Protein backbone atom coordinates (compact mmCIF):
# COMPACT_ATOMS: atom_id res chain seq x y z
CA UNK A 1 0.00 0.00 0.00
CA UNK A 2 2.78 2.42 0.91
CA UNK A 3 4.62 1.75 -2.36
CA UNK A 4 1.39 2.37 -4.31
CA UNK A 5 0.83 5.66 -2.48
CA UNK A 6 4.37 6.77 -3.29
CA UNK A 7 3.69 6.21 -6.99
CA UNK A 8 0.46 8.22 -6.74
CA UNK A 9 2.38 11.10 -5.15
CA UNK A 10 4.45 11.29 -8.31
CA UNK A 11 7.78 11.58 -6.48
CA UNK A 12 10.91 9.67 -7.40
CA UNK A 13 13.30 10.43 -4.53
CA UNK A 14 11.80 7.71 -2.32
CA UNK A 15 12.86 4.27 -1.12
CA UNK A 16 10.34 1.94 0.56
CA UNK A 17 11.92 -0.78 2.73
CA UNK A 18 10.10 -3.51 4.66
CA UNK A 19 12.17 -4.40 7.72
CA UNK A 20 12.06 -5.00 11.44
CA UNK A 21 13.11 -1.85 13.35
CA UNK A 22 16.21 -3.65 14.62
CA UNK A 23 17.38 -3.97 11.01
CA UNK A 24 16.84 -0.26 10.37
CA UNK A 25 19.11 0.41 13.36
CA UNK A 26 21.99 -1.06 11.32
CA UNK A 27 22.08 2.38 9.68
CA UNK A 28 23.35 3.85 12.93
CA UNK A 29 23.55 7.64 12.89
CA UNK A 30 22.57 7.93 9.22
CA UNK A 31 19.14 9.58 9.04
CA UNK A 32 18.58 13.34 9.34
CA UNK A 33 15.03 12.72 10.59
CA UNK A 34 13.01 9.67 11.61
CA UNK A 35 9.21 9.58 11.88
CA UNK A 36 7.84 6.73 14.01
CA UNK A 37 4.16 6.16 13.23
CA UNK A 38 3.89 3.47 15.87
CA UNK A 39 1.46 0.54 15.87
CA UNK A 40 -1.03 1.23 18.66
CA UNK A 41 -4.31 0.23 20.31
CA UNK A 42 -6.22 2.40 17.83
CA UNK A 43 -8.46 4.40 20.14
CA UNK A 44 -8.61 7.02 17.40
CA UNK A 45 -10.57 4.50 15.34
CA UNK A 46 -13.30 3.87 17.95
CA UNK A 47 -15.80 6.18 16.28
CA UNK A 48 -15.05 4.82 12.83
CA UNK A 49 -14.58 1.06 13.32
CA UNK A 50 -16.59 -1.23 15.58
CA UNK A 51 -13.80 -3.84 15.60
CA UNK A 52 -11.44 -1.23 17.06
CA UNK A 53 -13.77 -0.94 20.05
CA UNK A 54 -14.34 -4.67 20.51
CA UNK A 55 -10.65 -5.59 20.18
CA UNK A 56 -9.40 -3.00 22.68
CA UNK A 57 -8.11 -4.26 26.03
CA UNK A 58 -5.78 -3.13 28.80
CA UNK A 59 -3.48 -6.03 27.92
CA UNK A 60 -3.41 -4.80 24.33
CA UNK A 61 -2.43 -1.32 25.48
CA UNK A 62 0.43 -2.74 27.55
CA UNK A 63 1.61 -4.88 24.62
CA UNK A 64 1.53 -1.91 22.25
CA UNK A 65 3.47 0.26 24.70
CA UNK A 66 6.20 -2.36 25.02
CA UNK A 67 6.46 -2.59 21.24
CA UNK A 68 6.53 1.20 20.89
CA UNK A 69 9.38 1.52 23.39
CA UNK A 70 11.44 -0.95 21.36
CA UNK A 71 10.73 0.79 18.05
CA UNK A 72 11.67 4.20 19.47
CA UNK A 73 15.02 2.91 20.71
CA UNK A 74 15.91 1.37 17.35
CA UNK A 75 14.83 4.54 15.53
CA UNK A 76 16.99 6.62 17.86
CA UNK A 77 20.04 4.55 17.01
CA UNK A 78 19.47 5.22 13.31
CA UNK A 79 19.19 8.99 13.84
CA UNK A 80 22.29 11.14 13.44
CA UNK A 81 23.39 13.62 16.13
CA UNK A 82 21.36 16.78 15.67
CA UNK A 83 18.61 14.83 13.89
CA UNK A 84 14.87 15.14 14.52
CA UNK A 85 12.68 12.35 15.91
CA UNK A 86 8.90 12.44 15.42
CA UNK A 87 6.61 10.05 17.28
CA UNK A 88 2.91 9.55 16.59
CA UNK A 89 0.05 7.19 17.37
CA UNK A 90 -3.66 7.11 16.54
CA UNK A 91 -4.57 6.50 20.18
CA UNK A 92 -5.27 8.73 23.19
CA UNK A 93 -4.23 6.93 26.38
CA UNK A 94 -1.31 8.18 28.48
CA UNK A 95 0.47 4.80 28.53
CA UNK A 96 1.15 4.67 24.78
CA UNK A 97 1.90 8.37 24.42
CA UNK A 98 3.43 10.40 27.26
CA UNK A 99 4.15 7.20 29.16
CA UNK A 100 6.24 5.78 26.31
CA UNK A 101 8.03 9.11 25.91
CA UNK A 102 8.78 9.26 29.64
CA UNK A 103 10.37 5.80 29.57
CA UNK A 104 12.31 6.72 26.43
CA UNK A 105 13.73 9.87 28.04
CA UNK A 106 15.07 7.78 30.93
CA UNK A 107 16.67 5.36 28.47
CA UNK A 108 18.16 8.18 26.34
CA UNK A 109 19.16 10.39 29.27
CA UNK A 110 21.56 13.14 28.23
CA UNK A 111 21.06 12.52 24.51
CA UNK A 112 17.98 14.67 23.86
CA UNK A 113 17.26 18.37 23.49
CA UNK A 114 14.07 20.25 22.63
CA UNK A 115 13.26 20.64 18.96
CA UNK A 116 12.42 24.07 17.59
CA UNK A 117 9.09 25.03 19.11
CA UNK A 118 6.17 24.94 16.70
CA UNK A 119 3.71 27.79 17.06
CA UNK A 120 0.14 26.47 17.01
CA UNK A 121 -2.84 28.76 16.51
CA UNK A 122 -5.37 28.11 19.33
CA UNK A 123 -8.11 28.26 16.71
CA UNK A 124 -6.82 24.98 15.28
CA UNK A 125 -8.05 23.12 18.36
CA UNK A 126 -4.77 21.26 18.94
CA UNK A 127 -3.90 20.57 22.59
CA UNK A 128 -0.20 21.33 23.04
CA UNK A 129 1.98 20.14 25.89
CA UNK A 130 5.40 18.83 26.83
CA UNK A 131 6.95 15.67 28.22
CA UNK A 132 10.53 16.47 29.14
CA UNK A 133 12.30 17.63 25.97
CA UNK A 134 9.40 16.45 23.80
CA UNK A 135 6.88 18.95 22.48
CA UNK A 136 3.54 17.10 22.32
CA UNK A 137 0.37 17.61 20.32
CA UNK A 138 -3.02 16.00 20.91
CA UNK A 139 -5.62 16.07 18.15
CA UNK A 140 -9.01 15.15 19.59
CA UNK A 141 -11.91 14.34 17.23
CA UNK A 142 -14.24 16.78 19.01
CA UNK A 143 -11.72 19.62 18.49
CA UNK A 144 -10.28 18.96 15.01
CA UNK A 145 -11.46 17.38 11.78
CA UNK A 146 -10.65 13.67 11.60
CA UNK A 147 -10.53 10.80 14.07
CA UNK A 148 -7.70 12.20 16.16
CA UNK A 149 -4.10 11.26 16.97
CA UNK A 150 -1.07 12.09 19.12
CA UNK A 151 2.28 13.47 17.95
CA UNK A 152 5.54 14.55 19.58
CA UNK A 153 8.95 15.84 18.49
CA UNK A 154 12.44 15.89 20.00
CA UNK A 155 15.95 16.48 18.70
CA UNK A 156 19.01 14.29 19.24
CA UNK A 157 21.71 16.25 21.00
CA UNK A 158 24.41 17.23 18.53
CA UNK A 159 27.78 15.65 19.26
CA UNK A 160 29.63 16.77 16.17
CA UNK A 161 26.41 16.54 14.16
CA UNK A 162 27.96 14.47 11.39
CA UNK A 163 26.06 11.72 9.64
CA UNK A 164 27.76 8.37 10.07
CA UNK A 165 28.94 6.83 6.81
CA UNK A 166 27.51 3.38 6.26
CA UNK A 167 29.88 1.00 4.43
CA UNK A 168 28.82 0.35 0.84
CA UNK A 169 28.03 -3.28 -0.01
CA UNK A 170 30.86 -5.07 -1.80
CA UNK A 171 28.53 -5.78 -4.71
CA UNK A 172 26.32 -3.01 -6.09
CA UNK A 173 22.72 -4.18 -5.47
CA UNK A 174 21.42 -2.14 -8.41
CA UNK A 175 22.03 -3.29 -12.01
CA UNK A 176 22.77 -0.03 -13.79
CA UNK A 177 21.50 0.32 -17.36
CA UNK A 178 23.88 0.06 -20.32
CA UNK A 179 24.54 2.93 -22.73
CA UNK A 180 21.91 1.87 -25.29
CA UNK A 181 19.16 1.64 -22.69
CA UNK A 182 20.20 4.95 -21.14
CA UNK A 183 19.86 6.74 -24.48
CA UNK A 184 16.24 5.61 -24.80
CA UNK A 185 15.33 6.27 -21.17
CA UNK A 186 16.80 9.77 -21.17
CA UNK A 187 14.29 10.85 -23.83
CA UNK A 188 11.47 10.51 -21.30
CA UNK A 189 12.69 12.73 -18.47
CA UNK A 190 13.66 16.31 -17.81
CA UNK A 191 17.28 16.93 -16.83
CA UNK A 192 18.43 13.49 -18.07
CA UNK A 193 22.05 14.35 -17.36
CA UNK A 194 21.18 14.36 -13.66
CA UNK A 195 19.74 10.84 -13.67
CA UNK A 196 20.89 7.24 -13.49
CA UNK A 197 18.86 4.21 -14.51
CA UNK A 198 18.81 0.66 -13.21
CA UNK A 199 16.98 -2.53 -14.17
CA UNK A 200 15.18 -4.68 -11.62
CA UNK A 201 13.54 -7.83 -12.94
CA UNK A 202 13.27 -6.44 -16.46
CA UNK A 203 11.77 -3.12 -15.36
CA UNK A 204 13.80 0.08 -15.45
CA UNK A 205 13.83 2.70 -12.69
CA UNK A 206 15.20 6.23 -12.67
CA UNK A 207 17.21 7.83 -9.85
CA UNK A 208 18.47 11.35 -9.45
CA UNK A 209 22.24 11.35 -9.03
CA UNK A 210 22.25 12.45 -5.36
CA UNK A 211 19.73 9.71 -4.61
CA UNK A 212 21.36 6.86 -6.53
CA UNK A 213 24.20 6.27 -4.06
CA UNK A 214 21.84 6.42 -1.07
CA UNK A 215 19.41 3.94 -2.64
CA UNK A 216 22.26 1.59 -3.55
CA UNK A 217 23.46 1.70 0.06
CA UNK A 218 19.96 1.19 1.46
CA UNK A 219 19.33 -1.72 -0.90
CA UNK A 220 22.46 -3.41 0.40
CA UNK A 221 21.30 -3.14 4.03
CA UNK A 222 17.49 -3.20 3.94
CA UNK A 223 14.78 -5.04 2.02
CA UNK A 224 13.84 -2.23 -0.38
CA UNK A 225 10.65 -3.16 -2.27
CA UNK A 226 10.29 0.08 -4.24
CA UNK A 227 12.58 2.99 -5.07
CA UNK A 228 13.06 5.72 -7.62
CA UNK A 229 10.55 6.31 -10.40
CA UNK A 230 9.33 3.29 -12.35
CA UNK A 231 10.16 4.01 -16.00
CA UNK A 232 8.81 0.88 -17.69
CA UNK A 233 10.19 -1.92 -19.86
CA UNK A 234 12.18 -1.89 -23.08
CA UNK A 235 10.86 -3.78 -26.09
CA UNK A 236 13.25 -3.89 -29.06
CA UNK A 237 15.01 -0.85 -27.66
CA UNK A 238 11.84 1.22 -27.25
CA UNK A 239 10.41 2.10 -23.84
CA UNK A 240 6.92 0.94 -22.98
CA UNK A 241 6.30 3.49 -20.21
CA UNK A 242 4.90 2.55 -16.82
CA UNK A 243 1.90 4.33 -15.34
CA UNK A 244 4.13 5.71 -12.58
CA UNK A 245 6.13 7.64 -15.18
CA UNK A 246 2.97 9.51 -16.22
CA UNK A 247 2.46 10.56 -12.58
CA UNK A 248 6.08 11.61 -12.06
CA UNK A 249 6.22 15.27 -11.02
CA UNK A 250 9.86 15.89 -11.87
CA UNK A 251 13.15 16.35 -10.05
CA UNK A 252 13.26 16.72 -6.26
CA UNK A 253 14.41 19.97 -4.73
CA UNK A 254 17.45 19.83 -2.48
CA UNK A 255 18.88 16.50 -3.65
CA UNK A 256 17.64 14.47 -0.70
CA UNK A 257 16.29 10.94 -0.55
CA UNK A 258 13.03 10.24 1.24
CA UNK A 259 12.75 6.91 3.01
CA UNK A 260 9.30 5.57 3.80
CA UNK A 261 9.14 2.56 6.10
CA UNK A 262 6.11 0.54 7.06
CA UNK A 263 5.34 -0.90 10.46
CA UNK A 264 6.24 2.25 12.34
CA UNK A 265 9.95 1.62 11.85
CA UNK A 266 11.14 4.86 10.47
Predicted regions and their residues:
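S-adenosyl-L-methionine
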Residues: 1-29
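Mobile active-site "lid"/loop adjacent to the S-adenosyl-L-methionine
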Residues: 19, 33-73, 90-98
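Conserved Class I S-adenosyl-L-methionine
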Residues: 31, 59, 67, 98-124
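Core SAM-dependent methyltransferase catalytic element
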Residues: 33, 135-166
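Helix-to-beta-strand junctions that scaffold the AdoMet/dcAdoMet cofactor pocket
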Residues: 79-81
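Conserved beta-strand signature within the Rossmann-like core of class I S-adenosyl-L-methionine
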Residues: 84-89
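Class I S-adenosyl-L-methionine
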Residues: 116-144
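Polybasic, low-complexity RNA-engagement segments
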Residues: 147, 157-266
Amino acid sequence: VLADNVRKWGVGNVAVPVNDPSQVARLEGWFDAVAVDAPCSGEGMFRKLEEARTEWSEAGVALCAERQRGILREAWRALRPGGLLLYSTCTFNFTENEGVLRDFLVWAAGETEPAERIAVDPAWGVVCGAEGDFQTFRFYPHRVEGEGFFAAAVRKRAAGGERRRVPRPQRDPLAWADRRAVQELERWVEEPEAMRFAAVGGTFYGYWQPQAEAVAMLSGVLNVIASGVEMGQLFKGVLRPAHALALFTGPPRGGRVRVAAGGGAA
